[in-house]
Amino acid sequence: MDGWNAVAREALGVEAFRWQDREEGAEVVVRFVPAAADQPRGYAHLDADDAGVIRLPVHLDLAEPVAMGATSRETVLFQVAAHEIGHALGLPHTDDPGSIMCCREGAVNLGDPGVRARYVEARRRPDVRSVLPQLRELYPRFWQR
């Protein structure tokens, strides 16, 4: 959460999150769900109005993480949680293999060695700062009404 708040302060001038121990009244609720082989490792349940404003609360489901090659369970959990929190902020998938919000299915050519190296590095060392350009682009259109 601290990482996301630092990114939000830099991009938007405000903090995005405040920790709350109770689900009641929370705007973003994180739930841990059983892992299933045919399901994604995380999922953001959210809805938006016609103007694109997200309705609250947003529910984030995170599956039990498993190590992926040289990437630890803890890193996988952080990467998936950070990605789903990005959706809670309204961020879509991106084609940037270095972004925490990568990737739209089929949008990145992992057969390209340079692209693959960047993608793997971003999964092994996920960085929420990778979404700064997306946040800076997304929110001003809501705040300038």
Where are these regions (language model features)?
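Metzincin-family zinc-dependent endopeptidase catalytic domain
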Residues: 1-88, 92-95, 106
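Cell-envelope/ECM-targeting effectors and their regulatory/trafficking segments
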Residues: 3-6, 141-145
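The catalytic-center signature of Zn2+-dependent metalloproteases
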Residues: 74-144
